[in-house]
Design a protein with these regions (language model features):
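Bacterial N-terminal signal peptides that target proteins for export
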Residues: 1-12, 18-21
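Residue-level detector of beta-propeller blades
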Residues: 60-63, 81, 91-93, 160, ...
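Acidic/hydrophobic-patterned starts of short beta strands in beta-sheet-rich repeat architectures
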Residues: 67-74, 119-132, 203-211
Length: 256
């Protein structure tokens, strides 16, 4: 009986140590930042020789390293992944996302948000941001919407989230008379804004943390009251909803 108990205890210890080892080596999923100025001139030359598309633009390359020590580069709509060694760099994969040309009259543009989003270990996505602005007498707005693209091993991309609210800031004139200016004490606009913070929770599950703020001028005739709100949404990346479940007034898309 004693032998049996000792054997069972050993099994429990082995199981526990295996669990601890798994916990130690299962690195948490982290969003990684592309940054400029991390490559030497020599390194940049070596990389550009392998993927000339990266260096056709005059913008400085943005780079990062993932936990497996592969090097990732971002330049405009071009993304590339390289193995690193003492002898240099070897191209592993590359992707091209076609970005819309900036239209000055429409005040709109697209860019890749300089972060690498983990879907699961060694499986990543990027966000393409559509941005536009509008202006009107005494006010205006800037709006950003995000679409997320998986970077597949084949070199292709797959869009799995489309046109989600990402950020906006808007102000609307509230003072129209001398009395308004006096009563508002210099605060002559209604202002509201929305921000988004994304946190990976586990493989194929992200949490979208929306934060909304409304600041109403004392001179406003909108009937609104100043307000701050938040909503945390768990998004299953296998079947993301068409749009996030946030209040309609938080989802400003422009006056149209």
């Amino acid at each position: 009986m004693l032998k049996y108990k000792m054997g069972l205890g050993g099994m429990i210890l082995i199981g526990a140590s295996a669990y601890i080892s798994a916990s130690v080596f299962a690195a948490p999923l982290q969003i990684l930042d592309f940054k400029k100025g991390q490559l030497s001139a020599t390194e940049q030359t070596q990389l550009c020789e392998q993927v000339k598309e990266l260096c056709q633009q005059r913008t400085q390359l943005q780079s990062l390293k993932t936990p497996d020590q592969t090097l990732w580069l971002l330049s405009e709509g071009n993304i590339a992944q390289f193995a690193t060694s003492t002898t240099g760099f070897k191209l592993l994969k590359q992707w091209r996302i076609q970005l819309a040309a900036s239209e000055e009259m429409a005040r709109s543009s697209q860019y890749i948000f300089p972060k690498l989003f983990p879907m699961e270990q060694n499986r990543y996505a990027v966000a393409v941001i559509d941005t536009f602005s509008e202006s009107y007498s005494g006010g205006g707005a800037s709006v950003e919407r995000a679409s997320f693209y998986e970077l597949k091993d084949s070199g292709k991309t797959h869009r799995f989230i489309e046109n989600y609210p990402f950020h906006f800031y808007r102000m609307i004139r509230a003072c129209f008379s001398e009395q308004d200016y006096e009563s508002s004490k210099g605060k002559c606009h209604d202002e509201d804004s929305l921000g988004l913070d994304i946190r990976p929770i586990k493989p194929m599950l992200w949490q979208f943390r929306y934060r909304y703020s409304l600041d109403v001028s004392p001179a406003s005739d909108s009937g609104e009251k100043s307000f701050k709100g938040s909503r945390n949404l768990n998004i299953d990346l296998n079947k993301a909803p068409e749009q996030p479940n946030i209040p309609e007034e938080w989802d400003y898309e422009g006056a149209g």
